[in-house]
């Protein structure tokens, strides 16, 4: 679209596939339709699920891609905002309709996801097709916090199938202020610690750290937690992992071969020279680490540090270098296996649709809540799905406890009842078996989605190919 708009001779943006092309074959035990695709009829020549790539399912249930398309093709678009002068410039993208006769415009200012001001913009003058107009928009901008201006376009009068006020699309503009950091992350990062020593014990394979309410156990072979217990409540079903793998998407079909040749799907963390430092009010565990897989040299090398404070905060500092010669990474992050009952998700970042570095046109910055099941995108062929980009905060909870991840540097997260290994193993969504845990991935980096099933390779700026990779994250455990 950037190319199309830059040159009047260009056209494009046409929908490649409206619906998933798949054949219904009854229903699953839980009542969902079972769909067949290429190869399911024992035919020798077929395209697999190549045509299961629509904007809607075979029974016309919208996929997230349809929401993306809707907002990409919105009727109006912000082309400039002068925050100092309070002037918002909007272009009419319609070919035949005056914008002022078609829609109304409202705005919201969001600070760290929360709405702090809202109002309507005056669209009184005619705006002919493809013309621009400048509107006055002078909200009060908070001096601190990550702030965004959300401009929403709504239908001004009823039309067939649509009612007045129907959302036609939106634009989001980042706002500048004196301190654009997420303030809750700032508060947690600077939370004062006491001066009481923490209890530390060590064996050949474990390091145990105890505060008044929190017990942490780390595996010295990985440098990662194997148990986190707060007031008697265990938060980990399985040991934590450093994670560079994802269930390949349809568009990963070519790069997947390189990923598997590099054994990314088998890569795990290994720690060397683990040290413990005890100070009043906190304990630091540091280790030289690598991400390694069988038969190949380490994919990543670097340093990992955990800091545990007497205020029950665990802080992770991860600094890694990617070994030259390896392909770009699918992702880099921390994978936690929480109890399945922890299925409520509250997050501050891009939502409510799934979002990736190159797929986020249907999302905006806000504070959202959902269940783990709500976040799953039920593609017929299971694959990576449901990530949310540019987040500073996510809380996973049940009625008894919560785990909150906070960071000043934005991260992506994914919460699912399915492991990435299960998504890879199954041919169709109705064959998936829940893991019995809530699988929480906290990612410092996540590769884009792209269009390499039949289009060009993923653009370099959307690849995880930096030599230096890092992650800073705070985990706060709470019981009720």
Annotated model-derived regions:
Residues 117-119, 166-171:
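Extracellular and select intracellular beta-sandwich modules with Ser/Thr-enriched
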Residues 97-105, 118-119, 326-333:
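Short, hydrophobic/aromatic beta-strand segments
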Residues 138-145, 159, 174-480:
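Beta-strand/loop-rich accessory regions of lumenal/periplasmic or secreted enzymes
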